[in-house]
């Protein structure tokens, strides 16, 4: 199944994005991924990862504890995100989609949240001076390289998060798991510390430990 929306909707998204861009301050670390040649096998794999595009399914968990842990994470992250996204349903849908797309790409949700914070400040229609778009500041050339060529659709929440996660996963693979270098490549500043340090610092704000899943501490022994 391919990610498709009617052309009219894409035009509407483009107009909304343009208006939003005029109202937004410049983005300090906005992405500017550099277009590089892709091997046919890499292009095919990334296109396949992008193209498997049904909306996030009903989440399934191995057991009730895993589901309850996810719900606790969702509640905690929603509370943290409230100041940046005040509308409750939009906030929950964003977090559900980000969790799904992060896990699908083998990424830590806290890392992706940190990247979104640095890249766009959680603004759906953010546009950088280099033309990067949306939450994860995806460059338009990616729509041509691994998508259907319609860069306007990069403003759609799930599409933007999917592209961003697939691209970051690709850069991690290229850099053989070196997160520092992969983040620099994502931002077009490979080898420089400012951007990776900003994302890794932001990740700490979104890290979460499920206290309910921790083993209870042993009772203190009493002297006799």
Descriptions of predicted regions:
Residues 20-21, 50-52:
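Residue-level detector of alpha-helical hydrophobic segments embedded in or interacting with membranes
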Residues 29-39:
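Cleaved targeting-peptide boundary
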Residues 39, 43, 71-74:
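Onset of an N-terminal alpha helix
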Residues 32, 53-224:
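Catalytic glycan-binding domains that act on GlcNAc-containing polysaccharides
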Residues 1-18:
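N-terminal secretory signal peptides and thylakoid transit peptides that target proteins
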Residues 23-25:
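N-terminal signal peptide c-region/cleavage motif recognized by signal peptidases
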């Amino acid at each position: 199944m391919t990610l498709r929306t009617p052309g009219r909707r894409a035009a509407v998204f483009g107009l909304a994005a343009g208006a939003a861009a005029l109202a937004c301050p410049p983005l300090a670390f906005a992405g500017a991924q550099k277009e590089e040649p892709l091997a046919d096998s890499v292009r095919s794999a990334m296109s396949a990862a992008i193209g498997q595009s049904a909306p996030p399914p009903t989440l399934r968990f191995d057991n009730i504890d895993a589901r309850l842990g996810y719900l606790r994470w969702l509640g905690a992250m929603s509370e943290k995100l409230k100041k940046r996204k005040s509308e409750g349903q939009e906030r929950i849908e964003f977090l559900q989609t980000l969790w799904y797309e992060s896990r699908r790409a083998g990424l830590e949700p806290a890392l992706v949240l940190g990247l979104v914070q640095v890249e766009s400040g959680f603004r759906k229609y953010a546009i950088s001076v280099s033309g990067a778009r949306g939450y994860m500041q995806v460059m338009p050339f990616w729509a041509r390289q691994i998508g259907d060529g319609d860069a306007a659709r990069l403003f759609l929440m799930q599409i933007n998060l999917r592209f961003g996660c697939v691209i970051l996963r690709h850069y991690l693979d290229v850099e053989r798991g070196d997160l520092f270098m992969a983040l620099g490549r994502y931002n077009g500043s490979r080898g420089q510390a400012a951007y990776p340090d900003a994302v890794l610092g932001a990740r700490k704000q979104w890290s979460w430990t499920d206290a309910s899943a921790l083993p209870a501490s042993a009772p203190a022994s009493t002297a006799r």
